[in-house]
């Protein structure tokens, strides 16, 4: 499955997730949605989010090293409202590359971090938010 096909499958499942009639059907669709996220195929240029506990950093995939190892860089951002959590995500990349490895559970975790409490990568959306309470 290619990267484009895997993201199309996720969008299809997300569309079906909006129309459910029973709780069992919703649960089955949520499981299918989670599976589609785990099966996403990374590609250079895909927008993603690095999740640091309560903070989110917008990033872009810069290299696919292997099928289970990728490099990402932060996107530049413009702060519109720090305490309101509003940021403009710019296309320019900044900072050094960070390596993420896909674990057996399907999650992308920063190289050298534990699966349980490690820094995660979300391939299915791009968001930037710095928690002002820390």
Question: In which residue ranges do the predicted regions lie?
Answer:
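Residue-level recognition of beta-strand termini and adjacent short loop/turns
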Residues: 65-66
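Mixed-charge, low-complexity intrinsically disordered regions
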Residues: 1-58, 69, 74-134
């Amino acid at each position: 499955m290619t990267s484009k096909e895997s993201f199309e499958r996720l969008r299809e499942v997300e569309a079906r997730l909006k129309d459910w009639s029973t709780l069992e059907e919703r649960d089955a669709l949520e499981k299918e949605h989670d599976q589609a996220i785990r099966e996403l195929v990374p590609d250079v240029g895909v927008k993603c989010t690095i999740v640091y506990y309560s903070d989110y950093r917008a990033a872009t995939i810069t290299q696919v090293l292997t099928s289970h190892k990728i490099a990402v860089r932060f996107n530049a951002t413009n702060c519109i409202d720090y305490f309101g959590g509003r940021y403009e995500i710019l296309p320019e990349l900044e900072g050094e590359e960070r390596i993420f490895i896909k674990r057996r559970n399907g999650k992308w975790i920063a190289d050298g971090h534990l699966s349980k409490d490690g820094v995660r990568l979300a391939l299915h959306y791009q968001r930037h938010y710095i928690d002002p309470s820390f």
